[in-house]
């Protein structure tokens, strides 16, 4: 009887910043947790479904952190590790790991169409798992150059034709792979990894310029589908799962994060367990009046187990001394204050009579126009107070900086 444990994770985004705050320390804590979890649970296979890095050009510290993790992984119970690239990854940087870990069963797949995209995992010479890898690819490249002049036209038939062909291309590729593997390796568990948007609709759809592929393109030929790209833990079907990101990376994300552990027994998936990831950072958005925000900060508990990043939106204008009070209270509670913004009831006064600045106006007006318009509104509504410069002096100073800036005199300042 053979038992194996598989851990599915994705979207680490190592090197990610919360505004200007580095969270590399928190990400290091996550990777330490993950390594210890793998040791404790005796994980046999680690699947990382894309976006290891946040930038296509990660810095030295980010690369060292990732490389050290995979190096340490090679000394654990983990027999294999399979990683695919996401839309944030660049294969050149990920490939460093591949060279470092050649002695370890480390498989890195960065090409959508490649002989390496079918990974055969063996234990003592016996084939145990097959992992099919579909790293992220710009969907428009899937169909080649034939649709370059079709996509983007306003003609409804052209865009509909593109979407139908894109869905069919996904479906055909996955179906061909599934049928080939089933005929050649019958009875061996097959896992598919992909990094893209998939949804529960029956037909392909678009949202904000992104394509949402129906998950039914996966068919029924895989024991498990390990997905990356969406930061929320989500099951499209019981065996089609987004593991989500391990940490909160935006203020509209929940801080509930998971890693998914699969239990295989005699080539069958018998159990899935979603283990919560400890909170290493928390992003909080606080909105209200000055007094409400100050009360919130005064009553907040100091957290030592994780780092807090705070965004504040005030519904009333305050002076700089009030903003300083907010910053001071945040610091006392070990909170990183990302920004203070305003959502004022009279903000429509900033807009022109048509209620919105028209497209023509945006094209015709320059930086001076928008600076003067915003500055005048700030003076009239009390956002700017207690400064030694008059409105006219600030405008004159801005014009000077703008002129010198164009000449490059402020480039190093």
Swiss-Prot record:
Coiled coil: none annotated. GO terms for molecular function: 3'-5' exonuclease activity; endonuclease activity. SbcCD cleaves DNA hairpin structures. These structures can inhibit DNA replication and are intermediates in certain DNA recombination reactions. The complex acts as a 3'->5' double strand exonuclease that can open hairpins. It also has a 5' single-strand endonuclease activity. Pfam families: Metallophos. This is Nuclease SbcCD subunit D. The gene is sbcD. Belongs to the SbcD family. InterPro entries: Calcineurin-like_PHP_ApaH, DNA_Repair-Maintenance_Comp, Metallo-depent_PP-like, Mre11_N, SbcD. Heterodimer of SbcC and SbcD. One of its GO terms (biological process) is DNA metabolic process. Keywords: Exonuclease, Hydrolase, Nuclease.
């Amino acid at each position: 009887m053979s038992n194996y444990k598989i851990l599915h994770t994705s979207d680490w985004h190592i090197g990610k910043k919360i505004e200007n705050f580095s969270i590399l320390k928190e990400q290091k804590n996550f990777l330490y947790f993950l390594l210890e979890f793998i040791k404790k649970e005796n994980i046999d296979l680690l699947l990382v479904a894309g976006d290891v890095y946040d930038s296509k050009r990660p810095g030295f510290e980010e690369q060292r952190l990732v490389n050290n993790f995979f190096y340490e992984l090679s000394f654990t119970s983990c027999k294999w590790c399979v990683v695919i690239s996401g839309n944030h990854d660049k294969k050149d940087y990920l490939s460093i790991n591949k060279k470092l870990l050649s002695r370890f069963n480390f498989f890195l797949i960065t090409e959508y169409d490649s002989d390496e995209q079918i990974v055969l995992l063996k234990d003592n010479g016996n084939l145990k798992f097959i992992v099919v890898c579909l790293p992220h690819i710009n969907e428009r490249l899937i169909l080649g150059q034939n649709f370059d002049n079709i996509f983007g036209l306003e003609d409804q038939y052209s865009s509909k034709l593109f979407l139908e062909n894109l869905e069919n291309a996904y479906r055909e590729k996955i179906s061909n792979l599934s049928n080939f593997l089933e005929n050649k390796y019958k009875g061996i568990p097959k896992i598919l990894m992909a990094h893209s948007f998939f949804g529960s609709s029956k037909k392909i759809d678009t949202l904000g310029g992104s394509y949402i592929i129906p998950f039914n393109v996966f068919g029924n030929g895989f024991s498990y589908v390990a997905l990356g790209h969406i930061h929320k833990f989500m099951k499209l079907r019981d065996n089609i799962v987004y593991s989500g990101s391990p940490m909160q990376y935006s203020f509209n994300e929940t801080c509930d994060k998971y890693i998914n552990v699969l239990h295989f027994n005699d080539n069958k998936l018998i159990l899935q367990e979603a283990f919560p990831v400890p909170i290493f950072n928390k992003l909080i958005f606080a909105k209200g009046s000055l007094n409400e925000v100050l009360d919130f900060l005064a009553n907040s508990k100091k957290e030592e187990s994780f780092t807090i990043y705070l965004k504040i939106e005030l519904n009333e204008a305050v002076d700089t001394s009030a903003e300083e009070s907010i910053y001071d209270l945040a610091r006392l509670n070990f909170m990183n204050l990302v920004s203070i913004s305003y959502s004022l009831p009279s903000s429509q006064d900033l807009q022109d009579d048509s209620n919105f600045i028209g497209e023509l106006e945006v094209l015709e007006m320059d930086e001076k126009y928008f600076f003067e318009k915003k500055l005048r509104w700030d003076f009239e509504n009390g956002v700017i107070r207690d400064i030694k410069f008059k409105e006219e002096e600030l405008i004159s100073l801005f014009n000077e900086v703008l002129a010198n800036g164009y000449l490059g005199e402020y480039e190093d300042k």
